[in-house]
Amino acid sequence: MLEERLGVNRSSIYAEFGSKQELFEASLERYRETVVDQRFGPLAEPGAGLDAISAVFDFYGDAAEGPAFGRGCLLCNTTIEPGPDDPTGSQAVPRYLERISNAFKSALDDAARNGEISGSTDTMQEAQFLTASVLGIFVMLRAGVPPAAISGVAGAATRHLASLESP
């Protein structure tokens, strides 16, 4: 299929990337750069705070209605499908999860500094919870869960953020 889409033969692809495994790893890296960094990168910008986190969940809640997300997330699928013994998944997935968790933590740290949330909030624990929430949304997308349920989960994450706000 790839050969047909690109109009090249398999040996040309392997000459460029070395092997099917190396092609897949290059695809994962490109996905991280173009999708993960684009979606989660703004969370690490100074002053991001709770609004930036809410925007991520709003995006996925709204996007669940569209056809582009029917198969979920490439890196999440790489985690689920091949299993923990797959060398690509075992290398790429921890970096992916760390990138997302660090982005959420950065925005939460900004929120704490700006007084949006209490300074005593465990921002690492909250970041890990938000990472698990967004990955859960990706799994739901992959499983073909109705869009209304996915939007509901995204809304619950946003309401959780509101519960962290300082009085």
Predicted regions and their residues:
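Helix-turn-helix
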Residues: M1-E22, A26
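Hydrophobic alpha-helical connector segments
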Residues: A26, R39-R71, T123-L130
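Short, basic, alpha-helical segments at the C-terminal edge of helix-turn-helix-like DNA-binding modules
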Residues: R30-V35
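Amphipathic alpha-helical packing segments from all-alpha helical-bundle domains
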Residues: V36, D51-S54, P87-R113, M124-Q128, ...
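Amphipathic alpha-helical segments used for helix-helix packing
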Residues: A52, P67-T88
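Amphipathic C-terminal alpha-helical segment
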Residues: A63, D110, L130-P147, H160-P167
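Hydrophobic alpha-helical segments that form the core
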Residues: R71, C76, T121-M140, V153-H160
